[in-house]
Amino acid sequence: MRRRNDGAGGSLREEFGDVCFHALGIIDQNREYLQMHLLASADLPTRQALSDIQIESARLDRTIRNAITLYQLENEELSELQPLDLCSLLEKAGRLAPDIQRSLEITLTTESGGIEHCAVMGVPDEAEQLLLHLISNALRACDAGGRVWVSLKQKKTGVALRVEDNGCGLMEEDPIENNRRFLSGAKLGLRICKLICRRAGWKLTLTARPGGGTRAQVVFPLASCEDIPPEMELHSGEENDIRAARFASRAAQEILLLRRY
């Protein structure tokens, strides 16, 4: 897939992001200062106003990041593919379960299907974004007491990552219409998922889950030995720690926003 390499566009995008995130950072710093000093003395409307500022600031931060990500996916070259372990990605999702249960009263369960290591080729950061978007979408469909399952399933041609929920379900019985509505709509998150999968050669589908709810499935071709040169490490301790922290931070923001509504 060929993409434009617009240096001027990239510079403008970076400047736009820097200005927006600097302004949001100042807003958050002042909000934290006020919350800290008014924790005991502020009346209920003031505390609610500060909480609203926190949530809407996080929402704006996420929207800007998603818009920038969408621009990059649509206009920039695909980054060099690297081996990534889907089992490690599944473990990161599992670590979110306590916060999700505490904040949203929704149970998240992960299941590896007996798979211990599963190497596929892709862009690790994009794979993490994909999983977070799918989990967030599943959580939005659920009320308190709902359930979300994230699992790996072995396929003949690869491995499938499934994110399922027992929430409100799809509105159309036609699978083609479901994919058109949910993967081609205005929501940035699902548009990002679609682009990530198309660029990497992964197959994304949305279907009704047996028993109610929705099943999002991504099928990954397994990486061959030729895809992973001996000098290319599947795991790097320091890099994994950085990625894990970033994944947790993104997830915390999503949970904060989901808690609002």
Where do the language-model regions lie?
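Short beta-strand/loop element within the Bergerat-fold HATPase_c
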Residues: G145-T157
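Short alpha-helical segment of the dimerization/phosphotransfer core of two-component systems
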Residues: I55-L60
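Short helix-loop "hinge" at the ATP-lid/N-box region of the Bergerat-fold HATPase_c
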Residues: N137-L139
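Conserved catalytic submotifs in the C-terminal HATPase_c
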Residues: T107-C118
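Conserved micro-motifs of the catalytic ATP-binding
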Residues: N75-E80, A119-G122
